[in-house]
Amino acid sequence: MARRRKRGYYLVEGLDLHEEMERLRALPIFAGGELARRRPELRVRRPSKKPNRVGFAIPGEWRISVTAYPGIRAGDAQEILLHELVHLHVGELPGAHRWHGRGFRLALHRAMVEAYGLEVPRPRSIHHGYYAEAIERARGPEQLELAVAA
C-alpha cells in the first residue's frame, strides 16, 4: 500500500491530488481493474520552472508522478493526474505507439468524459493542455467575492 504524506504535499492550486486520485479510481472505466483494487503511490514534483515532462507513470512500481510547475492550474493538474492513472490502467500496448497509441487515447478520452463531464471531440494529439483547457472552461470564470458595505 502506498504511503500517505502530509496533506500539504498533495495540494496543488487548491486541489488535493490524493483525494482527486481516490475519486478518479472509482470511475466506471477503472471498475474491475487493478486501479480500482490497489492504490498507486502518488508523488508530486515541484520544480522551479516548467519541465518538458509534466508527469509520468511507472507501472512496474505502481507509481505515478505529477509535476506541480510554476503557473499550473487545477485543470492542468487534473489532466496530468488522470493521464498517468490511465497509463497504469492500460499499461504498455503492442505496436509502434505502445504508450500513447489508439487504445490509450480512447481510454483517456473516456476517462475524461466520465471524470469531468467533458463534451469535446477526441484530440488528434496527446500533448498536454487539450483536456486541461476543457476542464478550466467547464469550471467557469472565477467568482469574485466582494464585502458588503455596512
Predicted regions and their residues:
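Active-site recognition of the HExxH zinc-binding catalytic motif
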Residues: E79-E92
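Metalloprotease/metallohydrolase-associated module, dominated by Zn2+-dependent proteases
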Residues: A2-G75, E92-A150
